[in-house]
């Protein structure tokens, strides 16, 4: 049983709604469309070899999250320092070459297997906007890997803040309003309860939770939340979301 569903939700049931209510889909990128967890694990094990062979996924993720907390800057270059923190904590090689390798590996994180096709289908009906805590350098790599599906994008190095800061959402709201879209036109789509679903709901957005870890224990590489926010829509995959939103 997924431990997420053992916790209570802090929102009430919503009246069923149609996807036709929306014109804009705003997407979290890393974790929702890009499989950063596999990217982190593969990079750590490739760089460290036998030294990392006995480390569990959860142990690596725990050190990775502490490294992100210790180095909260949102430039892709900070991943050099995040890896050094992780490596020292886990007793792995922490030389400059290893840190450089991890930083470069971050820019090569790949999409989930269903992301590209789902976005291609969704773009036939909706305006697609990336809302990412990554910087512009990283997003350019991820967008290319995803087939360049976005009509617009907002990055943390442009907003000056990162999600879950409400100012990030305010920045995008203002940006989309310049194109004639209201908040009620927007459905926010994300995996992270911490960075996206909880705060977006509090700000009055309709939200779609892509629960990438459905059926898996714990929160993986994403920060934990004490209570889950109940979304307006809930799917385990982007394919299932696209099937519901635009049909098969």
Go through the PLM ranges and name each one.
Residues 3-11, 15-25, 37-38, 97, ...:
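Asp-based, Mg2+/Mn2+-dependent phosphohydrolase catalytic module
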Residues 19-113, 124, 137-138:
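N-terminal helical cap/lid subdomain that shapes the substrate entry/recognition surface
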Residues 115-118:
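Alpha-helical packing segments of well-folded alpha/beta enzyme cores
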């Amino acid at each position: 049983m997924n431990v997420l569903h053992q916790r209570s939700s802090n929102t009430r049931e919503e009246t069923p709604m149609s996807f036709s209510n929306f014109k804009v889909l705003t997407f979290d990128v890393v974790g929702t469309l890009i499989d950063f967890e596999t990217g982190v694990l593969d990079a750590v094990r490739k760089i460290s070899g036998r030294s990392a062979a006995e480390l569990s996924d959860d142990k690596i993720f725990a050190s990775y999250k502490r490294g992100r907390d210790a180095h909260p800057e949102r430039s892709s270059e900070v991943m050099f320092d995040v890896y050094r923190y992780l490596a020292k904590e886990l007793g792995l090689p922490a030389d400059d070459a290893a840190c450089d390798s991890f930083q470069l590996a971050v820019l090569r994180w790949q999409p989930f297997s269903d992301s590209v096709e789902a976005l291609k289908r969704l773009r036939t009906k909706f305006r697609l906007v990336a809302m990412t805590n990554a910087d512009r350098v990283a997003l350019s790599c991820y967008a290319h890997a995803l087939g360049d599906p976005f009509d617009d994008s907002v990055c943390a190095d442009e907003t000056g803040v990162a999600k879950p800061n409400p100012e990030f959402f305010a920045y995008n709201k203002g940006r989309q309003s310049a194109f004639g879209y209201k908040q009620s036109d927007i459905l926010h789509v994300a995996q992270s309860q911490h960075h996206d679903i909880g705060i977006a709901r509090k700000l009055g957005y309709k939200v779609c939770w892509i629960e990438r870890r459905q059926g898996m224990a714990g929160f993986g590489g994403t920060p934990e939340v004490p209570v889950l926010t109940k979304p307006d829509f809930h799917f385990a995959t982007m394919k299932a979301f696209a099937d519901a939103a635009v049909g098969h």
